[in-house]
Amino acid sequence: MKDTILEVKDLSVTFTQYDRGFSRRTLHAVEKMDLSVRAGEIVAVVGSSGSGKSLLAHAIMGILPYNSAMDGEIRFLGTPLTAERVKKLRGHEIVFVPQSVSYLDPLMKIGDQIRNGKKDHSVKEKCLAVLKRYGLAPDIREKY
């Protein structure tokens, strides 16, 4: 059996919505979701607009909006994904890939988008490592 990379257990995401005065209500956006991703697997999260796909990603990345609350457990490589841990891993071990290609700039070279415009040598090496990890040739950096 392959090692589990990401495990989501009993995940719920709610939002507090404030109305006029002091009244408020709780909206249940994601309820009791389970997900497991093992080494070597490719997993697609599919659903209609508003079904919680992005909220799942935001919960994993630790970037839920201020008026939200999360319940449940998220583990990465067997260890709970705490706020401190996800902050260290975000952008390195765990990366958010937006669901819309409109977030990518068609006028910017691929390498520049990966490097976020930074030019120092260590960032260039990290860019090459990312391309290699996904089986892409180094010269793709110069393409749009």
Where are these regions (language model features)?
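ABC-family P-loop ATPase nucleotide-binding domain
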Residues: M1-T26
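The feature captures the beta-strand-to-loop junction immediately N-terminal to the Walker
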Residues: V46-S48
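Helix-to-loop junction immediately C-terminal to a conserved catalytic motif
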Residues: M61-L64
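Conserved ABC transporter NBD signature motif
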Residues: A69-P80
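ABC ATPase NBD coupling module
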Residues: P80-V95
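Q-loop/switch helix immediately C-terminal to the Walker
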Residues: S100, P106-D120
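Conserved ABC ATPase "signature" region
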Residues: K124-I140
